[in-house]
Every structure is written in structure tokens, then in C-alpha cells.
Design a protein with these regions (language model features):
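Conserved PLP-enzyme active-site core in the AAT-like
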Residues: 2-228
């Protein structure tokens, strides 16, 4: 048993057989029937309008930030979040986006008061806050799930302040199972979600990004720009 990470999970024999026999096509031309079915199913499961397959969770998160933010904008993130700690500074290096780290509590949450205090006032001297990012489950804090009630509260805060909410849901199915809720309920307050296929779901590679049709159309263009 390898307990380093769930990233070392491997496809089952049944999964390998399904891959070998899968219908294939060109995803860039959007005529790969298997990828299309995967994207349709992902959007349906998360009750969002559209979905996009990406090579990695890191790319999925970066695409979300690039769609939600313009260069020079600011995003509120947890100081122990994967986006802030473990994604090679992509938001800044490739997007010109400034992170505003907020302390993660032991239960993985960001205090609502801390989020509110981090939202920049309208002022020519300040960056413009565009986005709040949550991570569910929160990996560094022990894999704890963020509750539906908490996620709804953050979503309400985002809407009241004209911000978007992105969820790094690399392990969102773990959270849904632990909380005994559906993933679509758990992500309902969000504008976009990334979830991984290559962790507990045991696929060899890949992640999904879900959101509105307009969001995914822009993300598809940016995926090509990033080489995906």
C-alpha cells in the first residue's frame, strides 16, 4: 500500500480495457466521442452548463483564474491552499494576477470576516478583487471537507460583493462522500469548479473544469494558448 498520495492510484483492469476499446477522435475539433461524453457527464453531475477536459488540476485551476481575472486583478486564496503553495506561481507568472493569502483555519475554512477584510475598496491605488478560491477537501489541513453551509456562506459573500467563486475540488468527491451530499449541492454556490480524475478516481491522467458555457468557451481558448 502506497500512502504517499492518492495521485499514485492506478487504473483497474476494467478501466484499462475500457480505454483500449474506447471510441476516439480529435478533441481539438471537438469530435472525440469519449471526451465529449465525459464533458457532458461532468457538467450534468455538477449541474453546470458546460465542462472541459484538461491535462492536470493545476492547469484547470490556472484556466479558471485566467478566465475570472484580468492582469493586475487580485484573488483571495487560503495561505495553505494548493493554488497558492503548489502551483508554481502560475497565476502571477502567466496571468499577472496577484494572490491575497488569507489564513486557513484548522478546519480548512477561511473566516468570513477575513475574506471581507481582504476585499479591496474601490480606489485607484489598489488592485481590484475579482475572485475567491476555496479548496474542498483542504489537503494541507488534513484533508478536511468544507461543509455545504460554509460554502453557501462564502458564495453569498461573493455575490454580495460582485466577486466570483472558484472551487479547487481536486478531491470534491471525497468531500461529498464525507458530508453525505451530492457534488452538485456542494458546488452550487460556485461559478466554476475543477476536479481531478487522477486521484481517488484512479484515472491515469486528467482533470475537469466545469462552469457556464461562456466560461468554458473562454477556458477552451486559453487551454490551447497554454499548450493543452
Amino acid at each position: 500500500v502506497d500512502l504517499r498520495s492518492d495521485t499514485v492510484t492506478r487504473p483497474t483492469p476494467e478501466m484499462r480495457e475500457a480505454m483500449a476499446e474506447a471510441e476516439v477522435g480529435d478533441d481539438v475539433y471537438m469530435d472525440d466521442p469519449t471526451v465529449n461524453k465525459l464533458q457532458e457527464k461532468s457538467a450534468q453531475m455538477f449541474d453546470k452548463e458546460d465542462s472541459l477536459f484538461v491535462p492536470s488540476g493545476t492547469m484547470g485551476n490556472l484556466l479558471a483564474l485566467l478566465v475570472h481575472c484580468q492582469r493586475g486583478d487580485e484573488v483571495i486564496v487560503g495561505d495553505k491552499s494548493h493554488i497558492y503553495m503548489n502551483e508554481a506561481g502560475g497565476m502571477s507568472a502567466l496571468g499577472g494576477i496577484q494572490p491575497h493569502p488569507v489564513k486557513n483555519q484548522a478546519d480548512g475554512t477561511l473566516l468570513l470576516d477575513d475574506i471581507l477584510a481582504s476585499i479591496q475598496a474601490e480606489d485607484v491605488h489598489h488592485t481590484i478583487t475579482r475572485l475567491i478560491c476555496l479548496e474542498n477537501t483542504q489537503n494541507v489541513c488534513g484533508g478536511v471537507p468544507l461543509s455545504l453551509e460554509y460554502t453557501r456562506a462564502v458564495g453569498k459573500t461573493a455575490r454580495e460583493n460582485n466577486l466570483s467563486l472558484h472551487i479547487d475540488g481536486a478531491r470534491i468527491f471525497n468531500a461529498a462522500t464525507a458530508l453525505n451530499v451530492s457534488v452538485k449541492e456542494l458546488v452550487e454556490p460556485s461559478d466554476s469548479v475543477m476536479f481531478c480524475l487522477s486521484k481517488g478516481l484512479a484515472a491515469p491522467v486528467g482533470s475537469m473544469l466545469v462552469g457556464s458555457k461562456k466560461f468554458i468557451t473562454r477556458a477552451r481558448h486559453l487551454r490551447k494558448m497554454l499548450g493543452g
